[in-house]
């Protein structure tokens, strides 16, 4: 009977002494109420009936929700703040025996420092510098929780809610700002369109003026060429007249009356032709002695037939 009791006691003692710690946890061992050691994940053995499990500490990173609270900003705006805190225990002994309730302590510490940090900022800074706020809170809370064996990995501001009337005012301000930007963009578009139109008209006027300039140049060049040709024609006529005069002079010197009659008859007929073809002529010119005219023409014919050397010269 006693042997059976001893066997049962021994088996029970062995079972009680075996402790299997799950992954991600550390267990503290107390002996007569005093901390002795920390059990790591896996199979561990303790002294039965003397040692006991003190605290089962979760060593994994976890999230603590920070309750919302109202904070008065530097510019006296009542703002409601929500936040979360990411923690990881690095020392199970300190987390179990240096603070009575670790989670509540971290919540109160975070809320206190949120009031301190955000209370020194204006509302616009709170809304625009959320990353800086997170960094400041992380540094402060992490430093304060080091003696507790806790590592603060992140502190995040979830929401910043100004009062309802202030939100309405901000919405009206943003709407006015968007309207202002839209008006500015529209005015800028109109200005650019006017500039492009004026530039196009300017280029058109330049091209038109350039075309007129080229036209005037070509016209002047044409007139110059025409005057040059007229001058050359007059010069040739003058040379021909001088040559004819020379021939007549030579004929007079040599006593050739046929050449003289030819020259006079030619001048006479040309003058009659010009007077007759003029549009403003109102007087009909007739020779005084038609017989002399006919005789001159006959003389011209005879002269042409008999004396071709005159024209060859």
UniProtKB/Swiss-Prot annotation:
Top-level taxonomic group: Bacteria
Family annotation (InterPro entries): Band7/mec-2_domain, Band_7, Band_7/SPFH_dom_sf, Band_7/stomatin-like_CS, Stomatin_HflK_fam
GO cellular component: plasma membrane
Database matches in SMART domains: PHB
Its membrane topology: Single-pass membrane protein
Keyword DNA-binding: no
Transport listed as a keyword: no
Transmembrane regions: 1-21
Pfam families: Band_7
Keywords, ordered alphabetically: Cell membrane, Membrane, Plasmid, Transmembrane, Transmembrane helix
Protein name per Swiss-Prot or TrEMBL: Protein QmcA
Source organism (scientific name): Wigglesworthia glossinidia brevipalpis
Lineage of the organism: Bacteria, Pseudomonadati, Pseudomonadota, Gammaproteobacteria, Enterobacterales
Chain's gene name: qmcA
């Amino acid at each position: 009977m006693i042997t059976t009791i001893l066997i049962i006691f021994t088996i029970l003692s062995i079972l009680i002494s075996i402790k299997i710690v799950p992954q991600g946890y550390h267990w503290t061992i107390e002996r007569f109420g005093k901390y002795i050691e920390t059990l790591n994940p896996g199979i561990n053995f303790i002294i039965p009936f003397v040692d006991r499990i003190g605290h089962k500490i979760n060593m994994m990173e976890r999230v603590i929700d920070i309750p919302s609270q109202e904070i008065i900003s530097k510019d006296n705006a009542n703002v409601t703040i929500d936040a979360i805190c990411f923690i990881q225990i690095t020392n199970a002994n300190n987390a179990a025996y240096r603070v009575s309730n670790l989670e509540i302590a971290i919540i109160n510490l975070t809320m206190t420092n949120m009031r301190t940090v955000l209370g020194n900022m204006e509302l616009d800074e709170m809304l625009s510098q959320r990353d800086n706020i997170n960094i400041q809170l992380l540094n402060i809370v992490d430093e304060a929780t080091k003696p507790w064996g806790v590592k603060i990995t992140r502190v995040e501001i979830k929401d910043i809610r100004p009062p309802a009337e202030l939100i309405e005012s901000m919405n009206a301000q943003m709407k006015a700002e968007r309207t202002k930007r839209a008006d500015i963009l529209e005015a800028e578009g109109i200005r650019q369109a006017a500039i492009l139109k004026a530039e196009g008209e300017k280029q058109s006027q330049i091209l038109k003026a350039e075309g007129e300039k080229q036209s005037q140049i070509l016209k002047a060049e044409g007139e110059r060429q025409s005057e040059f040709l007229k001058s050359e024609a007059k010069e040739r006529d003058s040379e021909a007249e001088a040559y004819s005069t020379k021939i007549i002079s030579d004929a007079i010197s040599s006593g050739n009356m046929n050449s003289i009659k030819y020259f006079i008859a030619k001048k006479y007929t040309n003058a009659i032709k010009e007077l007759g073809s003029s549009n403003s002529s109102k007087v009909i010119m007739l020779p005084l002695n038609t017989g002399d005219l006919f005789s001159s023409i006959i003389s011209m014919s005879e002269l042409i037939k008999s004396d071709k050397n005159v024209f060859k010269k």
